[in-house]
């Protein structure tokens, strides 16, 4: 990992959230399932002068909610899996894709084109009294070096693998689907999990560009699981998967306020 940081005007998370709306780690083999660490909810601040006319966003309905909270809410009929997916996709569009001054967190490489179909199927199973497991209907994101045997790409952030579609799910993904998880999308990362060079920038890849720290957008998100750390800290999914070699989960978790 490298301490190089994207340059430019300092733009912090409060400015982003004021303009556009604004993990615990559970080891799963060589990966981790991250959830928000229970930090205080972000406070919106005045937007930059160039965006002074922008309306303040509504509070995000799922702000800092845990997998347990969301599961209990679905069991009580407060949400469906489809509704959770809709809310997180809206959050991604608002905070990750656009962002203040055209710069969002850039944590998500790709969303799953089949995600609504998957969520609807899991909702039908719930209505029929069939629950696959503790993650039934929960939207989760995966680092873009983890194979999914679907229509999403698995590229390790490299343009060389830009059209690479895996033939089958990684074992980890098989287990997640068996437990009922909804694979919402893939997260950006340090290209080749930070094996691109000895002087690479944390969170940058040819495919995804630069991931930004959700607390201070021009600061280092660390890596190589940068998009997962930034995305879960920014409440872009209920939980996320990263991979660890030498700090690739621990460092983004530290920089982005996850445990």
Which functions belong to the PLM regions below?
Residues 11, 65, 226:
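Residue-level signal for the nucleotide or nucleotide-sugar donor/cofactor binding architecture
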Residues 135-259:
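Short glycine/serine-rich loop/turn segments
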Residues 5-6, 59, 73, 220:
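Generic anion/oxyanion-binding catalytic loop in active/binding sites
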Residues 15, 19-162, 192-194:
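Short, well-ordered alpha-helical
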Residues 1-11:
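N-terminal secretory signal peptides
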Residues 9, 63, 221:
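Aromatic-acidic/polar surface patches that form glycan- and anion
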Residues 6, 129-131, 171:
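Short, flexible, glycine/charge-rich loop motifs used to bind or transfer phosphoryl groups or to couple energy/partner
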């Amino acid at each position: 990992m490298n301490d190089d940081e994207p340059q430019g005007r300092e733009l912090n998370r409060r400015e982003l959230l004021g303009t556009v709306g604004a993990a615990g780690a559970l080891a799963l083999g060589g990966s981790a399932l991250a959830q928000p660490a229970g930090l205080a909810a972000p406070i919106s601040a005045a937007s930059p002068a160039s965006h002074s006319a922008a309306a303040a966003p509504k509070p995000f309905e799922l702000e800092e909610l845990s997998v347990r909270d969301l599961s209990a809410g679905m069991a009580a009929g407060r949400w469906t899996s489809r509704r959770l997916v809709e809310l997180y996709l809206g959050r991604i569009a608002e905070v990750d894709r656009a962002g203040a001054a055209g710069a969002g967190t850039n944590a998500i490489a790709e969303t799953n084109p089949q995600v609504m179909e998957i969520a609807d199927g899991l909702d039908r199973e719930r209505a029929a009294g069939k629950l696959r497991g503790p993650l039934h209907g929960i939207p989760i994101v995966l680092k873009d070096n983890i194979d999914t045997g679907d229509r999403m790409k698995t590229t390790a952030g490299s343009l060389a693998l830009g059209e690479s579609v895996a033939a089958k799910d990684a074992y980890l993904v098989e287990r997640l689907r068996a437990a009922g998880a909804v694979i919402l999308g893939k997260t950006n990362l340090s290209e080749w999990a930070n094996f691109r060079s000895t002087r690479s920038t944390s969170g940058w890849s040819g495919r995804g560009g630069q991931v930004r720290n959700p607390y201070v957008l021009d600061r280092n998100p660390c890596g190589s699981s940068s998009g997962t750390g930034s995305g879960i800290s920014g409440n872009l999914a209920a939980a996320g998967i990263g991979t660890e070699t030498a700090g690739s989960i621990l460092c983004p978790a530290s920089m982005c306020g996850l445990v």
